[in-house]
């Protein structure tokens, strides 16, 4: 393990021994790194313009001109008149053959920056186009035949003795490098080309090859060639050539301790390379010193704590030379570390006998053997984490003669490593009071001061340390910087401190992983990958692999983690590494078995039957399902694991809680952590280790933020703040609680206050893209669009290679109504994220470059979801399969899925569309009256406006309705239709008197047809339309309405005013013509009653519209929606009695179950409405619509919705109970004359006729319809299923059934939706 995280044996032994014997203890900083890496996102913080221009040049080299143009346009948006931008613009124009445009760009560049290098380069490029291609081909032939000197002369002549054009510079200097006398000039020229464009892989290859030509730079060239091999996906030709050159260069090298590892590494990847193997066995300069190599490897392994490997290397050396004193002494040190004192003594004595001249090296080790047994016992206790017993034994040992200093130093080191800083400081000062210049005590006390932030005092102590400890002093200074970084939650400050530490210790893997961790927390994941690249690409030491394993594990890259574990000896496993190794083994075994079953539950239970003392097993099983998107079984695994034993260990609680946070269950995580208290042991009686306390604090902060966000989504900002307050107070510098507080203000309808907080965080750390995204959104929410645009532009300039910067830009552009620009922003974000994800996955595959695996996927278990999102369906996932194959990037990566969904939605919103369908509707009732059958063919066109934020919709709906045929022979039905009561009475009277007159005709039924036009405008908070009921119906009405629905946090207010047709019947929908109006009987009646009857009787009646005014409040509280509202309406129609309605309702529904692609909601609804008059009849003046005087209903609706691949569905069913009451109503409410006649007919026929012969007594009794009170069940269903054939074409089928009041209604429709956009 790292020598800076270990404990010394004793001061006396260390001072007198030639080699330090180290005691391995848990690596605190490494474990902290593993627990802190729970979030990731993409970022890069290089100069934006240069990065974009480098990209443009890269795409130009690949001849992908569209990509080059996009990168160049982005650079132009940042600095349109920058010389380097104009230079690349000219290169692009030249590449696509537009020489005139390139010449114009050159003239503009010479005006903007006369004499600049950019102008010169572009001028050279245009000049190169005038070069004779035949001369150039001849020169290239000379170079190809090995005549480099002549070729260089030809190039110089071609360039008129000047600088080569940019496009020919690489081949010119590459040829020059083959001329020994001109090699320095060639190297300088290639170095300049590479510096000007690092993305030029061809130049990188030429430069690396040229360096290998010279022995003084050969190793640097090898390093560059190895780096180039990692760019197989970006530059496959150059990567392959680099591999060939690397192999060739190996054959030029001598075989020595420096070069042998490189050759062995090549052979491990290319075991069939017999030529290189022969070169190693029989090098040109004679055989290598095999014994010396083995001995050197043994001491390196011993220093790294790899005892088994060191023993094997020393034994190999002794097989060659059994009297090798250094190897014998090395075996003695190995035996002493292993606790075998007798064997150690034998080896030391043999080493002293083999070479008396070096005997003094081993005598101090022999002298220390007297107490080594007791120290070995202490080491075993420490290895077993029995720190209390180890401290007691050291205190006893310190009281023995001559052991005070050594035992006290070891005790102080142990106290310091276990967090007892004050006690360690006291012990160090005790030693220094006796031995003021004890070097180890001075360094130990300096470490304490560094950890406490007393940098000045620590450096004063280190100034007293001798030069022989220079390396240790440097390590302590670096440790101090890392301690200072760990004590600040200011991410920008932390990164700055750790960069300073890495500058002092560039190869230290623990510095690198802490810096990478800090960069990830800041959002700079791409930069974090670059920081870790050297140790991941070429892990030299066990510590490199340990740090790499912790990094890749925290990044979720299991394949790379397994790859690094394969190269690490189990002897080098720390507790954290061992836990990771166990988790990888469990996941791999379970994944292979899951592919053979359909139900994973038995396998989960079986996997969790074994003991799980650290929590690694439960986490492994849960994480396997989490990575597959199966949160149901992930939660099940954690629930089983955390309830198998009552007394969970701190490691188990911390591990399970961390995994619960990854699956967004902060409540379960908080419940697991509650027994740990604050970690001091006051609640449990056992204090946690420092790294466990740090993990506990991080989890508690994440839980506070997550619970606050959940309550915020439910609209309970007060309780949300109560949860958040401890996190705000515990660390006032922490960013995530501040951003959560801003979200609370935003949820409370105060986006201005949220913006203030977001801007304050952003001012403190301008690189924090999470804060920048939040600020952009808050600025848009508070109608500060110009500020949002400025903030987003700054983010793009700061981090042009970070997807989140472009997502913020998309928010700003969409708010400004720039639809196409928004899509470009989102596509840019998608491409950046895809590059990262594909790079990560490619690296885990066979033969892929390890450097591409450095960028972890973006997963943030603490990130809140927006209001209302909990009711939406998730992106489709592959269900039912547990194969080990990886999903495609855009479906398995959360950020990619989100961006792809936004692009898809925005493209659809921006695309005009056409819908067409065929629908049928049937409503119960008597034939010829209440019964209604409808067929319609809606044709709808939609035109998006304002970047899809609003739309203009045009529709025309051909419609046919019919009521069936009236039963003309029914003495019950006929009188209740139109004015047929009088006709029936006349006909029966005529028949009774045998007058012989012609009987009046009775209407047999009604059918109507027409088309309904409509124009609608709508956006997120207002909708308005104007149209008409079907033109062609007897009565046509102008219709329309407007609705306002502003939203304040989780609360939506709806206010609407509308005029709509009542479509209960043919009468109410289209109106009816009274056939009696122009009949002989009708004309006779008007003659008799004159003007009085003409005013009360017309040829048509019906066509009822409701003029409705409604208000409603809706509140989204997490997964629950509450609503309540009421309204008032006035119903009018042609020759129909005016009516009025009041209505009110309240209800709620909540999400009761969901997974990645399905949901179930259940609710309750209470409804009331009542009309002033009962107009549910079909005589003249009645409206023909259900209008009870009071109606009450309580229903329970259940909704089931989901989607799978291209199919989606939505089914809602409800059942309830209704009670309604209808008053009696006159036959002819609008005509006193007709009603008077009805009264006369009713009284006469009721008294003198029998029902079989005349009008039904039941029908005409008092000429009033009777009232009624009814109670019973109500309910129905509404179902829709849709299938998307392509991105443009979608087909929907829907059906419904409803029973309410005194009617039932059913309907069905098939419709097609077509988006007018490119495939």
From Swiss-Prot:
It is found in: Cell outer membrane. Residues 841-855 have a biased composition (Low complexity). TPR repeats lie at residues 49-82, 84-116, 291-324, 325-358, 405-438, 557-590, 701-734, 736-768, 1059-1094. Residues 1-46 form the signal peptide. The keyword Ribonucleoprotein does not apply. Pathway: Glycan metabolism; bacterial cellulose biosynthesis. GO terms for biological process: cellulose biosynthetic process; UDP-alpha-D-glucose metabolic process. InterPro entries: BCSC_C, Cell_synth_C, CellSynth/LPSAsmb/PSIAsmb, TPR-like_helical_dom_sf, TPR_rpt. GO terms for cellular component: cell outer membrane. SMART domains: TPR. Pfam families: BCSC_C, TPR_19. Transmembrane segments: none annotated. It is a peripheral membrane protein. Residues 841-890 are annotated as: Disordered. Keywords: Cell outer membrane, Cellulose biosynthesis, Membrane, Repeat, Signal, TPR repeat. Belongs to the AcsC/BcsC family. Required for maximal bacterial cellulose synthesis. It may be involved in the formation of a membrane complex for extrusion of the cellulose product. This is Cellulose synthase operon protein C. It comes from Komagataeibacter xylinus. The gene is bcsC.
